[in-house]
Amino acid sequence: MNYNIHPVTYLNADSNTGASESTASHHGSKKSPSSDIDVDNATSPSSFTSSQSPHINAMGNSPHSSFTSQSAANSPITDAKQHLVKPTTTKPAAFAPSANQSNTTASQSYTQPAQQLPTQLHPSLNQAYNNQPSYYLHQPTYGYQQQQQQQQQHQEFNQPSQQYHDHHGYYSNNNILNQNQPAPQQNPVKPFKKTYKKIRDEDLKGPFKCLWSNCNIIFETPEILYDHLCDDHVGRKSSNNLSLTCLWENCGTTTVKRDHITSHLRVHVPLKPFHCDLCPKSFKRPQDLKKHSKTHAEDHPKKLKKAQRELMKQQQKEAKQQQKLANKRANSMNATTASDLQLNYYSGNPADGLNYDDTSRKRRYENNSQHNMYVVNSILNDFNFQQMAQAPQQPGVVGTAGSAEFTTKRMKAGTEYNIDVFNKLNHLDDHLHHHHPQQQHPQQQYGGNIYEAEKFFNSLSNSIDMQYQNMSTQYQQQHAGSTFAQQKPTQQASGQLYPSLPTIGNGSYTTSGSSHKEGLVNNHNGYLPSYPQINRSLPYSSGVAQQPPSALEFGGVSTYQKSAQSYEEDSSDSSEEDDYSTSSEDELDTLFDKLNIDDNKVEEVTIDGFNLKDVAKHREMIHAVLGYLRNQIEQQEKEKSKEQKEVDVNETKLYPTITAF
């Protein structure tokens, strides 16, 4: 509040009383610009202090006494600053207008709820204003109305959400406030927001109904529905029926191009033809898939690359394992044959050739029947049994007993396992390994010659068994003598309880290079051992010079050195472990493949020009041919027995039997 009052105004107040009255009357008719005073200045205690107060008269109308005459408790401002409690105003008897007051004054006090403020800064300068006794009666009402206006402004600014509610009671009693209150406004209508339903699994089962405007056609698949929308409803510019506004359930979407409206139609059709390669999600439009793919590229690029690398490694491992299994299955016949040969190479058991019965041969060779048949037919061709079987079919040799006798004599002469048969079987074995058959030779019916072939290969098998037994016996005798000769010096060396350590001589220090190191190790007359000793002091004598530092090194390791590895190697090892790639895995796989427990590198033993390993292979081949021939003989005998039974049955019956179809 501004309480600074110019003193000249109070000095001229008593002398110019008439002028002040004329001024008051003048302002009663027309409001001067000086009447626009602040509320704080107008409602100050000094402005409302009456000149009729006895306290002011006692002080001699002093401005200082008028400034301090009223206390702050009687001011209407303090009433406004207190809690809002609506006071109950009672009109006393003095509220009625007195006789000495004019009618204008009474009407002015009743018609104006808020009385006009004085034009001067102090009420003692305006006699008309000071002569109104009803001012203090209306003053609390004025303060209460001002307080209501302030509270209304406070509620309008601080509580905007309550301005549309209709308050009863307090505001309804104040007609002055309700006159200026605006009518409540209704909420504006928001535009309709388009929402699209998500496609569920049930939506993809159909049937699918066209909801374009008044069309009610039903389709079985969403693809046909989409084609119907594009062709019939959207149309084409060339057909003069192009429609770029979507009428699906009053969608109302309008586009500029036909491609845009056809792409928009996928939103309504439950069709998701665009699939993500990195996750199982599918999308209706290609732009949706493109937007989705960015999430994979931005969020998890490293994880995706790592997952792809791991997937590639897993696929490579599975492919390698499948390839290894296929190779093992393809070579199962050779592996089983080699294992049997390795067990029976040097056993010397005379019953080895008799342990191959028909059931074991069937079980061994049924896994790769094509290869077995090729081997058997090749062996029979080499021993001229195929030609002999075809001989009766040739017209030039039919009935010629000389050719049959010649072949029989040649067979009988070749039944012994000699060096010629050994070379022939070796040549055949090499041919089978280098030239694998592409197709199987057809089985041929040998007729009566199959018995001759079985007899020939049976005698040849017995001859090979005898040869193999004699050779294995000779090898065991030689091997036993060599092992005894090797064990004898070993036993002599083991007579000493503890082995002696080599020492280094004094005269070995003059050598240089590799001879110097050899002298350090091989000289046994010295006093220094060939192995390093940690922190051993060297002897010093006046006649012998101090030993050079090279004497302290043994293979690059010093006697004062605790570790021969540097710390850099450790760091390199850790980096190599981090950079572990598929190439290292391949190397490990190859190393593990080489760690097979087999005796492939068996030393070759040759006795009298026969290789013991080749003889074992030849024995297996002849046994295979012999087993095949025996199976053929059994089948022929079974067929003959069946035919004989049918003939016997037909001869015993007098009348033929009629069978029903």
From Swiss-Prot:
Residues 626-654 form a coiled coil. Keywords: Coiled coil, Cytoplasm, Metal-binding, Nucleus, Repeat, Repressor, Zinc, Zinc-finger. Residues 567-586 have a biased composition (Acidic residues). It is found in: Cytoplasm; Nucleus. Residues 43-54, 145-163, 173-189 have a biased composition (Low complexity). One of its GO terms (cellular component) is nucleus. Residues 12-35, 59-75, 98-118, 479-514 have a biased composition (Polar residues). One of its GO terms (molecular function) is zinc ion binding. A zinc finger (C2H2-type) spans 208-233, 244-268, 274-296. Induction: By alkaline conditions. Transmembrane segments: none annotated. InterPro entries: pacC/RIM101, Znf_C2H2_sf, Znf_C2H2_type. A motif (Nuclear localization signal) lies at residues 290-296. A motif (YPX[LI] motif 1) lies at residues 498-501. A motif (YPX[LI] motif 2) lies at residues 531-534. Residues 1-75, 92-118, 143-189, 287-331, 479-524, 558-586 are annotated as: Disordered. Binds to DNA. Interacts with RIM20, which binds to the YPX[LI] motifs and is required for proteolytic processing. Transcription factor that mediates regulation of both acid- and alkaline-expressed genes in response to ambient pH. At alkaline ambient pH, activates transcription of alkaline-expressed genes (including RIM101 itself) and represses transcription of acid-expressed genes. Specifically recognizes and binds the consensus sequence 5'-CCAAGAA-3'. Required for the control of alkaline pH-induced filamentation (dimorphic switch) and virulence. Belongs to the pacC/RIM101 family. This is pH-response transcription factor pacC/RIM101. It comes from Candida albicans (strain SC5314 / ATCC MYA-2876) (Yeast).
